[in-house]
Amino acid sequence: MQDLIPYLIFTMIGYLSGSVMYSKLLPSLFKHVDITKISDDGNPGAGNVFKNIGPSFGMLCLFCDIFKGIIPVALCLYYLTWDNPLFSMVLAAPVLGHARKGKAIAVSFGVLLGLLPSSWMVLYLAVPFIFFSTLVRFNPHAWRVVIAFLCFILTVYVRVPIPALQLGALLVTITVVARHGIYIKSTHEKLRVDLGWNPGWLKRRE
């Protein structure tokens, strides 16, 4: 019981932190704009702030969405350890809080950044995201997210022999994939694969 309470406290802190939708709140407060009403998909995410309001305000919302994941995880590791399986809930809580209304990409990176410098697990998500956004592009974006997170969780289970981190990463992956799966199902958009580089030598040979 003594071990349970501290982890539950940080889990609640993380969930509440994740529940604050900065990409909806800040544009509403300072720009008097409801980002869910003016965006194409109605998602209260930083990407829609970039697209509909501008890069400077988009960066502000992005940082807030990332840091709301970093802070509870980093605070928990300052006082506790990830040796307890309950740490998996601390890791997943900000993502679960955000996913009630959003797609939870930025906050997922945030919780993984909160593990630094003890774990560089964030790279296992960043690398497939970059790869599938530049060299081989999976479109629409929701498909890219799903495939990147599936690569992430497979890599975690191969490379990270820590049960709490494996379970936490699995909970994060299930949450994000489920949210994007709902979007894919609602829009009926099919997967398209494009090369992100320009194979000029192929064109010259033609």
Q: Could you describe each region identified by the protein language model?
A:
Residues Q2-K31:
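N-terminal signal-anchor transmembrane alpha helix
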Residues F50-I53, C76-Y79, G97, I105-R137, ...:
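Interfacial segments of multi-pass membrane proteins
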